A protein has these predicted regions:
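Cytoplasmic C-terminal tails of single-pass
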Residues: 1-14
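Membrane-proximal, non-transmembrane interaction modules
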Residues: 11-119
């Protein structure tokens, strides 16, 4: 399933991350890519080339809960800061971002599994 693949990718990413400075950027880029790939599969639409703003609009249109939407925005913006603004978070911050992504994927999976008549 898309969810299992995303969770496996997260686990693999965590196992291979030692916190070295040169690993930080690829780590955060991959976190965003995992979310994009998962959402692409669930939506059957390519989300890989969407900007963070476009991706957030897509999530907003889904009527996700405010907490989930806020968490997604926070994680994507932090990952963008690492990717584009040369922000180097502490290893603990990177691990926290990883945990947030894991929680986001769980929330999204519950959202996608809820019959639409209940939404």
């Amino acid at each position: 399933s898309a969810y299992r693949e995303a969770m496996d990718a997260l686990e693999e990413l965590s196992k291979n991350f030692s916190g070295n400075k040169e690993e930080v950027k690829p780590f955060h880029v991959t976190l965003s890519d995992i979310l994009r790939q998962y959402n692409s599969r669930m939506q059957q639409s390519n989300m890989m080339t969407k900007t963070t703003g476009e991706l957030l609009l897509c999530f907003k249109e889904k009527n996700l809960g405010a907490d989930t939407l806020s968490a997604i925005a926070e994680v994507l913006r932090k990952n963008d800061a690492v990717k584009f603004a040369k922000f180097i978070p502490l290893q603990t911050e990177s691990k926290n971002t990883w945990e947030q992504m894991k929680n986001i994927l769980s929330s999204l999976q519950q959202f996608y599994q809820t019959p639409k008549s209940q939404v």
